[in-house]
C-alpha cells in the first residue's frame, strides 16, 4: 500500500512534468533522459508504467485513503494523486474502474 502510494505519486509527477515540457516544446525523449540523470530520476520514469492503462491506481488510492482515515492519518497528496491518475486516464482514453465494471 505504501509502495503503491509512492509509485502513483511518481507517475503523477512524471506525467505533469513531461506534459509541461511538451507544452514548452522540449523533446520528450531528451527530457526523459535528462530527468533520469537528475534528482527527478525515479523507477516509474525509467520503466514507463504509465504506458499501461493503470487499472489499479484508483483502487489503490481508495484503499490508502480508507486506511489513513481509519488510522487518523492525514495523506492529502493521496487524494491529489487519485485525481491526477483520473486525468491521465481521461487524456489517454483509458477506462476508469466504473467503466470497467469495478
What are these regions (language model features)?
Residues 1-102:
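Helical "substrate-binding/catalytic lid" subdomain
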Amino acid at each position: 500500500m505504501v509502495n503503491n502510494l509512492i509509485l502513483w505519486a511518481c507517475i503523477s509527477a512524471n506525467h505533469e512534468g513531461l506534459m509541461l515540457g511538451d507544452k514548452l516544446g522540449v523533446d520528450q525523449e531528451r527530457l526523459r533522459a535528462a530527468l533520469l540523470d537528475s534528482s527527478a530520476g525515479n523507477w516509474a520514469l525509467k520503466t514507463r508504467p504509465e504506458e499501461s492503462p493503470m487499472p489499479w491506481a484508483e483502487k489503490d488510492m481508495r484503499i490508502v485513503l480508507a486506511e489513513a482515515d481509519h488510522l487518523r492519518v492525514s495523506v492529502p497528496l493521496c487524494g491529489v494523486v487519485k485525481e491526477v491518475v483520473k486525468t491521465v486516464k481521461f487524456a489517454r482514453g483509458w477506462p476508469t474502474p466504473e467503466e470497467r465494471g469495478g
